[in-house]
């Protein structure tokens, strides 16, 4: 069965939208689907990590952060702040808080 090469990107963006909407479980589901479609899609790893942190699931958050670090070596809060600008400051603060809760420094 042919695959849509953009499905992973769609799911990753949908996961990010769910995160912004405070729907962290849905964000995790969409990020996982994105990663199932394309395991190297770093954006999905980031959404999964931040959403897991906000859910307060230490096992999932630790595993997600480990996967993110494999997919994007050297990723840090400073990199995310610098490279992923967000329109609304409250969204940026919550996104960064998710990474902090997942164990990122």
What are these regions (language model features)?
Residues 1-105:
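Alpha-helical protein-protein interaction modules
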């Amino acid at each position: 069965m042919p695959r849509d090469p953009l499905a992973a990107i769609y799911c990753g963006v949908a996961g990010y939208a769910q995160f912004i909407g405070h729907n962290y479980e849905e964000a995790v589901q969409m990020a996982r689907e994105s990663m199932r479609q394309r395991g190297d899609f770093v954006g999905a790893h980031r959404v999964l990590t931040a959403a897991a942190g906000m859910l307060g699931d230490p096992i999932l958050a630790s595993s997600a952060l480990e996967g993110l670090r494999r997919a994007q070596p050297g990723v840090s809060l400073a990199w995310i702040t610098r490279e992923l600008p967000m329109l609304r400051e409250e969204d940026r603060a919550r996104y960064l808080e998710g990474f902090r809760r997942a164990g990122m420094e």
